[in-house]
Regions:
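Structural preference for solvent-exposed beta-strand-turn elements
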Residues: 1-430
Length: 430
């Protein structure tokens, strides 16, 4: 699937159920691996990234059986992981590498973690510093992977994140489960996704959550999970964006996770005038879930400020496209974190959208988009640069443009959503 051609669509119509949430699936496999007994996971979001987590915890001594989107994890116990004698390969999964490092800080032995070329460019000093303060020995390669960690007797800390990052927060909180008496506290400059806190609480760990701060207390054991994973909001977002932009669209998405730390994209779309309704609200696996209905409408420009960024960081590429078809100029501020994702997403977004006719100007911490409320010209070839979010952005751009778009490196969607293109075609009306 190295190249995919996406033809313009008249509208999107249909009902969809997107795969289980990747972030929550990672956590279910990882925490199930150190729980007592057997954890059962249904509607798991199986992709290249989450399969890396399965392979990693197997290498460390847990047992995992996977069949379709169902999985059983037989945990090794809270301190039962063992160094396999060779590096643990995290593939492209930054969530896995950072969260696993927090868990390994509480294990006996010396562990080495490696990743692919993309993951090896992403910063790791941001987890090495707090874990070192807690008593673990963490060595990076000039601030990147490969990484080695040697667990030790951990002491609780109060740590203020220099940058809002759910992965760093989760790493520190997971290490806090292994610390000596007293809470480990993480203070955030802006709210980030709280899946780790919710799952730990459901497994019997004492957790305190309040605005801008999360704390965990040490535990002797983790209770096994029995969880149905909500649909991945970030996988739903491309369909939401396209349906918002294509006149005549009527789209329903069932069983989507609507955790408020993840749905900033909906908040921003509503501010722009979008018609997105959430109904049948419920709770699954300790997470809020709902069904979404989306219809097309005219949109107006808006500004996304730094405090909002963590709640839609994965959707900001899509926001750039939506903003390009709105009335007026839209701005994203305080999104420097985009530069250290699977690609430099600020530059990648510009390189995809500008040749298609979207007027976008980049800055160090974001971008400005000059909206024109009509279809961009499209056409040509764009490079997904090995980044699944950029491939999905290019696909949506192809749907809403006047001319077809060719996407090179389209196979990168397999990192999070292997069936993305098939699902997209199933609802496109031409």
């Amino acid at each position: 699937m190295s190249e995919v051609v996406v033809e313009p669509a008249a509208s999107l119509r249909g009902d969809l159920a997107v795969p289980g949430d990747k972030s929550i699936t990672h956590r279910a496999f990882l925490l199930g691996a150190v729980a007592d007994g057997e954890s059962r996971v249904s509607r798991a979001g199986m992709s290249a990234d989450t399969l890396s987590t399965v392979d990693a915890v197997r290498a460390l001594g847990a047992e995992v059986q996977v069949g379709g989107d169902q999985a059983v994890v037989r945990g090794a116990g809270l301190r039962g992981l063992r160094a396999p004698g060779e590096p643990v390969d995290c593939g492209n999964a930054g969530t896995l590498m950072r969260l696993l490092t927090g868990v390994l800080a509480g294990q006996e032995g010396r562990f080495e973690l490696v990743g692919d070329e993309s993951l090896s460019r992403r910063p790791l000093d941001r987890i090495a510093e707090p874990l070192g303060l807690m008593g673990a020995r963490v060595e990076t390669t000039d601030g990147h992977a490969p990484l080695t960690i040697e667990g030790g007797r951990l002491t609780p800390i109060r740590y203020e994140l220099p940058v809002a990052s759910a992965q760093v927060k989760s790493c520190v909180l997971l290490a806090g489960v292994y610390a000596s008496d007293g809470p480990t506290v993480v203070v955030e400059p802006a709210p980030t996704r709280d899946h780790t806190e919710r799952m730990l609480e459901g497994m019997g760990v004492r957790v305190r959550r309040k605005l801008g701060e999360a704390a965990v207390w040490p535990a002797d054991r983790l209770q096994p999970l029995s969880i149905e994973i909500p649909g991945d909001f970030s996988s739903a977002a491309p369909f939401v964006a396209a349906a918002t932009l294509l006149s005549g669209s009527e789209l329903r998405l069932h069983g989507v996770g609507i955790n408020p730390t993840r749905t900033g994209f909906l908040t921003v779309l509503e501010r722009m005038g979008a018609r997105v309704s959430v109904f049948n609200r419920r709770s699954e696996g300790g997470e809020p879930v709902g069904d979404l209905e989306v219809a097309a409408t005219d949109l107006v420009a808006t500004t996304v400020r730094a405090r909002e960024v963590p709640t839609l960081v994965d959707e900001l590429p899509l926001f750039a496209l939506v903003a390009g078809m709105a009335h007026g100029d839209s701005v994203v501020q305080g999104a420097t974190e985009l530069r250290v994702k699977e690609s430099d997403r600020i530059e990648s977004v510009k390189n995809v959208l500008r040749p298609l006719g979207i007027r976008i100007e980049t800055r160090q911490d974001g971008f400005r988009v000059r909206g024109v409320p009509s279809r961009p010209k499209g056409g040509g070839v764009v490079d997904a640069v090995g980044d699944h979010r950029i491939a999905m952005l290019a696909a949506v751009a192809g749907l809403v443009s006047r001319e077809r778009v060719r996407i090179e490196g389209a196979e990168s969607v397999g990192v999070s959503f292997p069936d993305f293109f098939a699902m997209l075609e199933s609802i496109a009306v031409r």
